[in-house]
Swiss-Prot record:
Record motif KEN box, residues: 494-496
Gene that this polypeptide is encoded by: Ninl
Coiled coil region boundaries: 382-423, 461-515, 544-584, 835-863, 1057-1229, 1269-1331
Protein name: Ninein-like protein
Ranges of Basic and acidic residues composition bias in the record: 151-166, 939-951
Subunit structure and binding partners: Interacts with gamma-tubulin and TUBGCP4. Interacts with anaphase promoting complex/cyclosome (APC/C). Interacts with CDC20 and FZR1. Interacts with LCA5 and USH2A.
Length: 1394
């Protein structure tokens, strides 16, 4: 072990030793030694160690060196076990002869030694050869009392010893033995002179740890053993290396023999025995064994120099030295044979020498051997003593130098303290002046700031009230608008429901009228068949009337058609003006026209189209109302919160003000009471003094005239007695005066001394207290100024950061909203452009289709005009053929009721022939409207039902007239003319193909054939033509562009029109015959009455038609009203949007105002910084303080903590004020005590004066008889002396009173300063509270802005969701409308064909 490690373990042992030294003297008694051994883990060695150190004297004390020697001796005796060899031979410990000690001191013996017996020389020689053999391989480990044992004992307390590599733990010099001593020594059950072998020790360890029962250890059990012996920090790799090193046979287990060989393979069994001397360890073992009987001795030099160790000059701290160093040390002293001396002392010249063992060996040699060795030992001791003497001298010099340095340092410190005191006093005076100046400046500025803040607060509240009134007006207006909109919506809903009911009723009336018309037609046909004769020529006279009626109806129809076209155009314009969500999703404007005649689901869909509009508007209005309600609630909550806060602040301010006023009033009242008491006491004392003065004057003046009179009266008679009494009285008076004077002087001196001491103590305490309070107030004020400046800087920085964050957040929100709005606008624009393009495309296609249809219709019209002109030319000729035709009873072609022609047959009579001829005529008349599709583009689907109602009564009239047999008809048929009625549908079908126009024409022809009623006049023809035109107009919007006639069909159309014109001519001829027949039948009144009735019914039906038209007009007007209401709702919506924009502008305005307020707050906060800069320019000392404040301002402290600190400081100042008040109360009490004492003194003085007065009076009475004038003069002199003493006492009393008044003035000044400081602190606290409230308000405003932004975002999301829902609904409605259009297009032909 090197020097550093040894010094380290010695220092650690000394630290443990010092920790047990409770007295601090450097000596330990028995209890402290027991505690030290417990800390070192030496419970088993404790009795032996106590016996070695203390002996029988349990009250003795030992120092560190003695403990170290005994400690090493105990450990070396515990480790001095001789292992046995293989043959079982062991060396026996020699017994020593007891030598009596040379000196005994108590329980300690000095000069004792042991002489062990010599062992077997052969055994010793063999043992020495073994040691030399093993020493050639490894250096031997010595069982000496070195500091290795200290290292082993401290290994459990220090973790560093466990961090060494494993090989060093087992191979380092001295390490294994000390480790084995520690482990095996502490685990033994008892401490006895006879020890076990290493095998038994290892087995004992395994048994205590509960491992190795099978005689082998695995890796985990080896780790447990290593931890138990102090190797706690072995890593896994090191443990594996140790296990592989111990496992020599490689079976994966460590046996007991392998473990023992690995642990003790490097340990020498023992050291060789010398023929002349025994090793020191054996000496110490014998000493351990013989310590109980007190028969052993030690060296006298060693005992005198306790803890002495030789060769300290060559000791590096480890307790070992090289033999060369020892030999050279001896050579320096003149001893040349040092190597032989070492060998003779059984020390090897090739290894390090244990200096302690060498010391003991030399000590033993000094006692036993004379000669050169003794000289060498003495030289060593002399060298050691000289070395230590040099060290002591060096230490003394260092101590003296340190003492001089300390004195110099103390002088410098005193000088520095004086300078610092002067500097501090100057600084205090300067800071007091500056603080007063600053207080005045701050008071003025604080008053100005307070007035400005009050004005700003009033302005803020005025603005808030105005804004609140404006917002309340806006809310009221919005509520009124909301109620009006809601009322309008309810009215619109009611109107829609009423219109739906009216339309349903009209549809029911139409169905009833249709049924009535059919019934009337059947009745009329029956009547005409039965009663109308062909000879009644009266009907022919009514031809002109019927033509006029037809013309009137045609004009009315045209007017209605024009009116319907105009209404249709207006409806189309309205649809274009409506938003896309309210428009019809169909591609053509005729989608809704096909819904009214259907009367079913289409009718309900058309009527309820305005319901989504009203619901959407109502939802929007509800949302607006909720938003305004929320805004109003938020505004009310804000106003209420601010009002409550202001009220609380006012109440707190009033409360604090009242408390302060009450406190000040109490203090003033207490001071006034004290002042009144002092004044009363002063008045009383003055009165007492005046009374005393008067008494003294009276006593001095009254006896003057008496002595003369008495002297003259009694001089002669009582001269002898007067002299004797005078002497006695004089003596007695002198004694009494002396006694009274002494007592009064003693009392006065005591009182005065006590009062002076008390006064001095009070003055000193007050001055100290005043100085402390002044220093504290100055420090608190400066600290407060620093804190306020730092707080202002922090608040300014935080406010700037907060404003930047808010502005950045607002910018981000604004950018997001702008992006969302731009996206929304772009999307709306795209959808609008797409919709516009679609509508333009559809309208373009419709216009193209209409143009093509108009061309076709123009061609048809041209052909129709030619046919009509030919018909007009043929009319006279046909009329001329009438008589001839009536006379020809030829066969006719029969027409079946289903429209098919049959073969000519013989008719049984003229009546039947005529009856069969009229259905054919009716069929030919019904087929006539086919060539008149010129007005298809003008018809609208809304007037279809009206035209049907108008058309069916006319058809009834037409069908009722030609049922009477007519001669003209028979004449026509008799000429062999065959009616080509069934040819028209067959011609129309190939010409038009699968178009809807062919289907309508065919359905009209079939309907005319099924009726089997002959047409009687031209009015029926016109009505039939109108019916077909209405059907064609109704079917025109459903015709797609692909169904327009192509060029091939255009070539077929002229041929078809020519044939149809021929048929029309034939029908006209037949109608003329019918008219003549009706004119001839005019003679029959019954038939006329029937015709009159039919005409009246026709008029009634016309009036019904007019009513229906009026109802339609009213419905159109109602629709117009609804459209206006919708426009009003639009305007309201725009107004609401404008209101939202106004609210947003108001919020922006509020934000601007808040930023202005923040700027104003920053400006107000910047003013103190400006003041600080001004103070920096004016005052140099305050500039240093401000720099410190700016440096301290970098620290971040919360405002609430600062306010709390200020409150705590205010409480502390209040406590100090209370303490001052208590001190003042104590002073007043002491003053009262002094006054009471003074009063008692005055009373005693008055008693003495009264007694003195009585004595004087007696003396005067006696002197009136005996005392002469000289005696009176002496008494007067005594009275003057007393008066001087009384005046002196009054002067002292006046001085005391003045001092008391000065103290009271000082107390009042201190209280005034404290009030000023409290006022300043309260103002600072109020300012900080206001600033905190402003910060909270700004935070609340920011939070409200965030909430408003969130609401706006939610509103935008809701509108987007609603728009998506509306688009989805529009898509669904478009699909439904397409499906309904398809369904109607399929159902319409079937319904018309029925």
């Amino acid at each position: 072990m090197d020097n550093e490690e040894e010094n380290h373990y010695v220092s650690r042992l000394r630290d443990v030793y010092s920790s047990c030294d409770t007295t601090g003297t450097g000596f330990l008694d028995q209890e402290e030694l027991t505690q030290l051994c417990t800390k070192l883990g030496l419970e088993e060695q404790l009795p032996a160690l106590l016996h070695i150190l203390l002996g029988d004297d349990r009250l003795a004390r030992v120092n560190f060196e003695e403990f170290k020697e005994g400690f090493v001796a105990v450990l070396s005796s515990g480790s001095g076990v001789e292992p046995s060899d293989e043959e079982g031979s062991s060396s026996e410990s020699a017994t020593s002869c007891a030598v009596p000690p040379k000196y005994m001191s108590g329980s300690k013996w000095y000069g004792r030694r042991s002489l062990p017996e010599l062992g077997d020389s052969a055994t010793a020689t063999k043992y020495g050869s073994e040691q030399q053999a093993k020493g050639s391989v490894k250096p031997p480990l010595r069982r000496s009392a070195s500091l290795e044992s200290v290292e082993s004992l401290k290994s459990d307390e220090d973790a560093e010893s466990a961090k060494e590599p494993q090989n060093e733990l087992f191979e380092a010099q001295g390490q294994l033995r000390s480790w084995g001593c520690e482990v095996f020594g502490t685990l033994r059950k008892s401490c006895s002179p006879s020890f076990s072998t290493p095998e038994n020790l290892v087995q004992g360890i395994w048994h205590e740890l509960g491992i190795g029962s099978s005689g082998h250890l695995n890796e985990q059990e080896l780790a447990v053993v290593c931890r138990s012996i102090g190797l706690h920090s072995l890593e896994k790799q090191e443990l594996e290396e140790l296990f592989s090193k111990l496992d020599q046979d490689g079976d994966g287990r460590v046996s007991l023999a392998e473990f023992q060989l690995g642990l003790f393979g490097h340990e020498p069994p023992s050291l060789p025995a010398s023929s002349s001397l025994i090793k020191p360890n054996r000496l110490w073992s014998h000493y351990q064994e013989e310590s109980g009987c007190h028969t052993t001795t030690t060296s006298s030099l060693v005992s005198v120099c306790s803890g002495l160790r030789l060769f300290s000059s060559v000791d590096d701290g480890s307790g070992f030295a090289f033999p060369e160093q020892v030999i050279s040390a001896w050579a320096q002293e003149g001893i040349q044979n040092g190597r032989e001396i070492l060998q003779s002392l059984d020390f090897s010249v090739d290894e390090k020498v244990n200096l302690l063992e060498l010391t003991w060996a030399l000590d033993n040699e000094l006692l036993t051997v004379d000669g050169v060795i003794q000289q060498a030992a003495l030289a060593c001791y002399r060298q050691e003593l000289s070395y230590h003497q040099g060290q002591v001298d060096q230490l003394v010099q260092e101590r003296d130098k340190a003492r001089q340095d300390l004195e110099k340092a103390e002088k410098r410190n005193l000088d520095f303290v004086r300078e610092m005191d002067d500097c501090h006093s100057a600084l205090e005076q300067l800071t007091e002046k500056k603080i007063k100046h600053l207080e005045q400046e701050y008071r003025g500025r604080l008053s100005l700031l307070r007035s400005e803040v009050e004005m700003e607060r009033e302005l803020f509240w005025e603005q808030a009230r105005r804004q609140r009134a404006v917002l309340e007006q806006d809310v009221g207006r919005l509520q009124a608008e909301e109620t009006s909109l809601r009322e309008k919506l309810t009215l619109a809903l009611k109107e829609n429901s009423r219109l739906q009911k009216e339309i349903i009723e009209v549809v029911e009336k139409l169905s009833d009228s249709e049924k009535l018309v059919l019934r009337l037609q059947s009745d009329l046909q029956f009547v005409l068949k039965d009663k109308l004769e062909p000879q009644s020529m009266e009907l022919l006279a009514q031809e002109e009337q019927f033509t006029a009626i037809l013309n009137d109806y045609e004009l009315k129809c045209r007017d209605l058609q024009d009116r319907n076209d105009e209404l249709q155009a207006e409806l189309e314009g309205l649809r274009l003006r409506l938003p896309r969500s309210r428009q019809s999703p169909a591609g053509t404007p005729g989608t809704h026209r096909r819904r009214i005649p259907g009367r079913g689901p289409a009718d309900n869909l058309f009527v309820g189209e305005s319901t989504p509009v009203s619901l959407e508007t109502e939802i929007m209005v509800e949302q607006m109302k909720e938003h305004y309600q929320e805004l109003r609630m938020q505004l009310e909550t804000k106003v209420n919160y601010y009002e409550k806060e202001i009220e609380v602040m006012k109440r707190n301010f009033e409360k604090d003000k009242k408390e302060m006023e009450q406190a000040f009033q109490l203090e003033v009242s207490v001071l006034e009471g004290q002042k009144a008491d002092l004044e009363a006491l002063y008045a009383k004392s003055q009165e007492v003094i005046l009374g005393l003065k008067e008494q003294l004057q009276d006593a001095a003046q009254s006896p003057e005239p008496a002595p003369a009179g008495l002297a003259h009266c009694c001089a002669q008679a009582l001269c002898t007695l007067a002299q004797r009494l005078e002497v006695e009285m004089h003596l007695r008076h002198q004694d009494q005066l002396l006694q009274i004077r002494q007592e009064a002087e003693e009392e006065l001196n005591q009182k005065l001394s006590w009062l002076e001491a008390q006064h001095a103590a009070c003055c000193e305490s007050l001055s100290l207290q005043h100085q402390c309070e002044k220093d504290q107030l100055l420090q608190t004020h400066l600290q407060r100024v620093k804190d306020l400046a730092a707080q202002l800087d922090l608040e300014k920085g935080r406010r700037e950061e907060r404003e930047q964050e808010v502005l950045a957040h607002c910018r981000r929100q604004q950018l997001k909203l702008q992006a969302v709005m731009s996206e929304e606008q772009a999307r709306i624009c795209r959808s609008f452009t797409l919709e516009k393009e679609k509508l333009e495309q559809t309208y373009r296609e419709q216009v193209e289709g209409l143009v093509q249809e108009a061309d076709v219709l123009r061609a048809l019209l041209k052909n129709g005009t030619t046919v009509v002109s030919d018909q007009q030319e043929r009319t006279p000729s046909s009329m001329s053929l009438g008589p001839d035709s009536r006379q020809q009873p030829t066969a006719r072609q029969a027409v079946s009721p289903d429209g098919r022609t049959g073969a000519p047959a013989e008719w049984p009579g003229p009546e039947k022939a005529e009856g069969r001829d009229f259905p054919g005529q009716l069929c030919s008349i019904d087929a006539m409207p086919s060539p008149t599709p010129t007005l298809l583009s003008r018809r609208s689907s809304e007037n279809l039902g009206v035209r049907d109602n108008h058309q069916r009564p006319l058809n009834a009239e037409e069908g009722a007239i030609p049922k009477e047999p007519e001669p003209s008809a028979r004449t026509l048929t008799g000429q062999g003319q065959k009616l080509p009625l069934p040819v028209h549908p067959q011609m129309l079908e190939p010409s038009l193909g699968t178009t809807a126009l062919d289907r309508k024409a065919a359905s009209v022809g079939v309907q005319g054939q099924a009726s089997e009623g002959p047409v009687g006049d031209g009015e029926g023809v016109q009505e039939a033509w109108l019916q077909f035109r209405g059907e064609a107009t109704r079917m025109r919007p459903s015709l797609p562009c692909s169904e327009l006639p192509n060029p091939q069909e255009a070539t077929v159309m002229p041929a078809m029109s020519e044939s149809e014109m021929k048929d029309v001519k034939i029908k006209l001829l037949q109608l003329e015959d019918v008219v003549r027949a009706l004119e001839k039948a005019d003679s029959r009144e019954s038939y006329r009455a029937e015709l009159q009735r039919l005409s009246e019914e026709n008029l009634v039906l016309k009036s019904d038609l007019g009513k229906i038209q009026l109802e339609l007009e009213t419905s159109e007007s109602k629709n117009e009203v609804q459209r206006q209401e919708i426009e009003v709702l639009k305007r309201d919506k725009e107004q609401a949007c404008c209101d939202l924009e106004e609210l947003s502008t108001q919020t922006q305005k509020y934000k601007d105002e808040m930023s202005q307020l923040n700027c104003r707050v920053l400006q107000l906060e910047g003013e103190p910084s400006g003041l600080h800069t001004q103070k920096e320019e004016n005052h140099g000392a305050i500039q240093v303080l401000m720099k410190k404040l700016e440096e301290a301002g970098c620290r971040e402290e919360q405002q609430g903590d600062q306010i709390q600190n200020l409150k705590i400081e205010l409480e502390r100042v209040n406590e100090e004020c209370q303490y001052l008040r208590l001190s003042q109360a104590e002073l007043t009490e002491s003053l009262e005590e002094s006054r009471s004492q003074l009063y008692s003194v005055q009373l005693r003085l008055e008693a003495a004066q009264s007694q003195h007065g009585r004595i004087v009076q007696r003396l005067q009475e006696q002197m009136s008889q005996l005392v002469p004038g000289a005696r009176v003069a002496e008494l007067q002199h005594l009275l003057n002396v007393k008066e001087e003493e009384a005046r002196r006492l009054s002067a002292q009393q006046e001085e005391y009173r003045q001092q008391l008044k000065a103290r009271e003035d000082q107390v009042e000044d201190a209280e005034a300063r404290l009030r000023n400081v409290e006022w300043l602190l309260q103002e600072k606290v109020e300012e900080l509270r206001k600033q905190f409230e402003k910060n909270t308000r700004s935070d609340l405003l920011l939070k409200e802005l965030y909430v408003e932004n969130a609401h706006l975002m939610k509103a935008v999301q809701l509108t987007e969701e609603k728009q998506r829902g509306a688009e989805k609904k529009n898509c669904v409605l478009e699909e439904k409308v397409r499906a309904l259009n398809k369904l109607i297009s399929k159902m319409a032909p079937a319904s018309l064909s029925v």
